[in-house]
Amino acid sequence: MVLLKSLVVASLAAAVAAKSAVLDLIPSNFDDVVLKSGKPTLVEFFAPWCGHCKNLAPVYEELATALEYAKDKVQIAKVDADAERALGKRFGVQGFPTLKFFDGKSEQPVDYKGGRDLDSLSNFIAEKTGVKARKKGSAPSLVNILNDATIKGAIGGDKNVLVAFTAPWCGHCKNLAPTWEKLAATFASDPEITIAKVDADAPTGKKSAAEYGVSGFPTIKFFPKGSTTPEDYNGGRSEADLVKFLNEKAGTHRTPGGGLDTVAGTIAALDEIVAKYTGGASLAEVAEEAKEAVKSLKNSAELKYADYYLRVLDKLSKSEGYATKEFARLEGILKKGGLAPAKVDELTVKVNVLRKFVEKAAEEAKEEL
């Protein structure tokens, strides 16, 4: 009976160990797993009797689980440095727990000196590897985590970049965090906009904070496309305030939550021409004028949307009621929901353009009622 009980306990222990997402390291596998694998690895040197190690254990396991989807890009591992003292000595471990980051290219690790909470550890991994932890029950963050080594590569190019310089202990930063996540999600479909964050209190972020004049937290800076000189953001910190700011600066037409406003995709010069048609002008004359106007457009985005104006005019030449029917059809599809964000954007732009063709008729119908 005692033997059976021992076997059951051993089996349960083995099952628990098998489920762990944290890699166990010993002298015989350390070099192969950490130094020769080419994969960045965070290693905890711990002792079973250490109270701080016991407190860290569930957080460390959660970190490993949140990164398990990217195990080909980053590893979370641990060493019982009380049992394997040679390994601890090899890497200068003098207390427990000690966390060291190996970049997969060098035998010289970087000491982790941040907090032992999940957010701090996750942010550290994101800064070092670009891999973001997937927290249980939530989608991966769309905020771009930057540091001293990566911020230069993120600004000055073909993107407008909005950066929040924060500190883990800052209460206002914690209040901003969920709004910042929403903002990143709102602009996720806009390739020319990046929503980013720098832990300006971390050793890997202090240089950037000093360079860009950060003296308090949070500090928000806007780097326009093609510029490495930031503009200070001093407006409100609600999603609506931040969305409005980015729309004005980047020429986007987002609404809080990620939708597009009623102007998105429309072109003022073509709207004036369409107004002549809805006002009673000849369709053939309007279509010809629109084609000439399109030739003068130089913005690539405008040219893309201009094609749809011309397509609608062509359809109208074959069916007078096309714009009204297509407007109603696309609005119905949008109301049903269940579409991918890119498809929602595409249909919203078409509805906005079609509205220019039908709004005169809609106004007249209201007047008759």
UniProtKB/Swiss-Prot annotation:
Name of the gene encoding the protein in the UniProt record: erp38
Keywords assigned: Disulfide bond, Endoplasmic reticulum, Isomerase, Redox-active center, Repeat, Signal, Stress response
Species the sequence originates in: Neurospora crassa (strain ATCC 24698 / 74-OR23-1A / CBS 708.71 / DSM 1257 / FGSC 987)
Active site: C50, C53, C170, C173
First-listed, main subcellular location of the protein, grouped into a coarse class: endoplasmic reticulum
Thioredoxin domain location: 19-130, 131-251
Conditions for induction: By stress.
Class of the enzyme per the UniProt entry, highest EC level: isomerase
Protein name per the record: Protein disulfide-isomerase erp38
Catalytic activity as recorded in UniProt: Catalyzes the rearrangement of -S-S- bonds in proteins
Domain of life per record: Eukaryota
GO BP annotation list: protein folding
